[in-house]
């Protein structure tokens, strides 16, 4: 799976990650979303996007435009809670150096958390 490839690339680069990191609703304390990866000790979340989700043959049954809008709303809600989100596209992961550089660049602007 693409998430596994990214996790291994970044772990090899010395980053510690949590997979399927739950994003909790402040009102209920329950997860409303799961990020593909979280860079431990930071507020940086990584989402790995394939193209199938945004195609007419996606599993949700929604039109591609509706999928994009739903993803945008989900990401906006996550960002309002103070998380930073870096999106990687599946075709980018064939260039390991690019993935590591993008994540390191994103880390330059993150908050360190316990």
What annotation goes with each model-predicted range?
Residues 1-114:
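Surface segments flanking catalytic/ligand-binding clefts of nucleic-acid enzymes
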């Amino acid at each position: 799976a693409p998430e596994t490839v990214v996790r291994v690339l970044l772990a090899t680069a010395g980053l510690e990650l949590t997979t399927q990191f739950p994003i909790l609703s402040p009102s209920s304390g329950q997860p409303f979303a799961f990020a593909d990866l979280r860079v431990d000790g930071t507020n940086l979340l990584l989402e790995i996007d394939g193209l199938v989700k945004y195609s007419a043959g996606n599993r949700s049954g929604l039109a591609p435009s509706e999928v994009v809008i739903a993803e945008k709303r989900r990401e906006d809600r996550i960002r309002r809670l103070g998380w930073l989100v870096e999106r990687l596209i599946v075709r980018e992961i064939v260039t390991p150096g690019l993935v590591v550089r993008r994540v390191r660049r994103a880390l330059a602007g993150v908050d360190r958390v316990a």
